[in-house]
Every structure is written in structure tokens, then in C-alpha cells.
Amino acid sequence: MADKTDIISSSSDKASPPPPSAFRNYLSSGSKEPVLLLESAGKESCCIFRVPESFVALNPKAYKPKVVSIGPYHYGEKHLQMIQQHKPRLLQLFLDEAKKKDVEENVLVKAVVDLEDKIRKSYSEELKTGHDLMFMMVLDGCFILMVFLIMSGNIELSEDPIFSIPWLLSSIQSDLLLLENQVPFFVLQTLYVGSKIGVSSDLNRIAFHFFKNPIDKEGSYWEKHRNYKAKHLLDLIRETFLPNTSESDKASSPHVQVQLHEGKSGNVPSVDSKAVPLILSAKRLRLQGIKFRLRRSKEDSILNVRLKKNKLQIPQLRFDGFISSFFLNCVAFEQFYTDSSNEITTYIVFMGCLLNNEEDVTFLRNDKLIIENHFGSNNEVSEFFKTISKDVVFEVDTSYLNNVFKGVNEYTKKWYNGLWAGFRHTHFESPWTFLSSCAVLFVILLTMLQSTVAILSYLNDKKGNGNAAPPPLGLP
């Protein structure tokens, strides 16, 4: 585009009428720059996005890989060269396995090159031309597959630094679930099936095996998602977190969008009058009569929140660096991918409401065991959820927690629920307050009894004195 100094001039300058072609020249002056958001970015085929700076500013390290670059967005960055140097070695191991099945290298390369147009449409911005991008897809795709195959036990490789250094493997697990660090899932399928090392239905299984430890779920939890057709690895693992919500659970309210902004008491919605309001914090809900219950199930998604009467049932959240990074990138994916639902975003907003301050985290962590904190201080957990909830947009009428929000608000609106809950909290919260209240009640009853006895005694004395014979004259 035109330079800023070309646009700003003194008010005394007298500009002559521009030639007819000047406006078109101005528009085309920046056409040689790479397109940062393609027109195809709004289509279902586009699923890998560059996270905007407004998101990055809130969590600067959350969207950038620590040890390995996958795909074009972070290729060549200096701090990622350590694993980059190992990729050709793992690629060769993969090609050796394919060769045992009579599949040559050029067959796999050609299969990926034939997908070039589809691959380019999967990214939100314009990528460099030439075959280098396709070669990158082959290298990164084979690296990922080899990591999965080794970790699942399909291929043995002993004393390899990538798999024997715990910190390194943990970092790779996080890096493979970053939105900017993805290759299309169909590239992985093409290489996996084309190599004849495995069948397409096994790809999800070995991917789940790789991520099962940091997510800490049983085998049956993963099995139900074995046939899911993912867009990329982030989408695949995100799918396993989604609750099984029937259409009847979803609200039939008008279509409304909620945007959260920071207020004095936390994040508050900016919506029209038809919108479902958000809920109070955990401690305040407790004072309004809402009871919190831990929902225990290894096969249950942590998003399976339920409200039964005044009991809010929440699965345990094991919150650590891996899950926090995963949440952030899932929210970014749901915000940018046009064909995505909004379950993770809704859950984050829900938890952001509950965890408004450090005391709320302490209550759900220590008293109810709903949060298992491996992330940092209780205040850091609260700040995380409040920060990630800022400026996200989600559709209330398709929110899977819509009925929970409505049910909680309807219960807390009834003044007598809060009055009784407050009385119970004040006098019967713990054995000590209960004993203290009983002691006070005993003293009150004893005092009333003493007063009653004194009054009755006085009345009896007065009655007795009234019926007595008068004393003789002259005697006192």
C-alpha cells in the first residue's frame, strides 16, 4: 500500500486531480504481499488458522510450539531446530517400514503432491509456491506417524532420545495440539494407508494411544471416537472431549450471540434482553443454595456438567500445562473454523463464571475435589479462566450448557432458597458451627424455661397471698 508519508501532507498542499488509473494503482500497490486471510478461509475446507495477535497478547506462549514445528507456519524457527534435525531419521525409518510392504518413496511423495490444491485450501493464509510445501507435508506427516507407531508399540525403537527423555516427549504432545502447528488429517491418512503399514481405521487408535497419558482416560473413553473423521490432530482430540448431548437437551431460545467483556466482578455478558444470563461464582452460588457434587467417571468427558434440582454435578478437572494449552487452542479453533461447534468455549465460559477469584478455586479444589490443580496457584487458575473468557463469542441457543445456565439462574432467583441456604451456611456449615448453634439454642431454651418458671412461680405466690387470712389487728 502507499507509504504513510505519501498520504499525510500539510493542509496547504493543493493536490491536482488524479489520473483515471491512480485509484486502481493504489489498490494494487500491496497485491504482491502474501494474502494473510484467503477468501477460502470461510469455507468448510479451511481448518488451520494463524492465531491473531489479540489472542496471542493474552497468552503469549500458548500458541507457539516449544520443540517441534509441524506444517508451514513455524517452519525454520531457530529454537525448533533440535527436533527438525531428527525428522529425516524418523522419515527414513518410516520409509524402511513401507519398503517392507513393497511401497517406494516416490509413491508416497506423489500421493501427497496430488493433494496439493486440497492441502493449500486447508490453510487460512497464502503459502509459498512450489513443491517445498508438499515435501514438508511428507516429512512432517511421516514424523508424526512414526512417533505414533513407536509409542503404540507397533514399531520397536529402543533408547531413542525423543522417546526416552520425558520432558521432550511431553513437549511434543503439547506441540502436536497447537492450532498453528497442524497438517491436514487426510495427509496423515494418505501416508499411513499408502505405506500399507496400517489401515485407515487404526490411525485414530494410535493417535489416541499417544495422547492418553496426559488426558488420563480409560480405553473405552477413546473407543467410541475411533471412526471420527477429523480435520487435524487438534480436532481429533477435541472431539473426544465433547459430551454426548441429545437434541432434546438443547434450548429452543432465539438465536443470540454472547460476547464477554471484563467488568468489576469478572466477565459479564453484553447481550440483548432475550439472552440467557451467565451465572454467579461458586462461592456465591453456594450461598444461594446451589450444591456442588463431584461427578466421578473415568469414561466421562470433563464437559459432562449436569444440574439436578439444586445439585450441580461437575466431573473432575485435572488442570495442568497440557490441558491449559489444549483449551486455548480449542477455543481458537472453535472461534475461527466456520463448521465447528462451541462446546469447549462454552465450558470455558462456564468455569470462568464459577472461578471468579482465588476463593472459588479453593472451594472447588479443597472442599469438593472438583479441581485437581497442577497448573499453579489458585489465583493463577482463576486468572486463566477469566482471561481466556475475554472477547469470545458463542451462540447461546446451541450451547450445550444452556439448560444448566437457565436452571441455576431460575433457582437462585427465588429469594427463599438463598435465605434458607444462608441460614444453613451460617449455623450448620461445620460440626463446630453446628455445636455452637446448638449451644446457643440450648442457652436460649434454658433462659426461656427459667423465665417461664419464674413467671409461674410469681403468679402462684400472688394467688396464694390473695387467699390468705388477714393478720390480727394491732399486729404487723
Swiss-Prot record:
It is a multi-pass membrane protein. Its main location: membrane. Belongs to the UPF0481 family. GO terms for cellular component: plasma membrane. It holds the Pfam family DUF247. The chain crosses the membrane at residues 133-153, 439-459. It comes from the Eukaryota. Residues 1-24 are annotated as: Disordered. Keywords: Membrane, Transmembrane, Transmembrane helix. It comes from Arabidopsis thaliana (Mouse-ear cress). This is UPF0481 protein At3g47200.
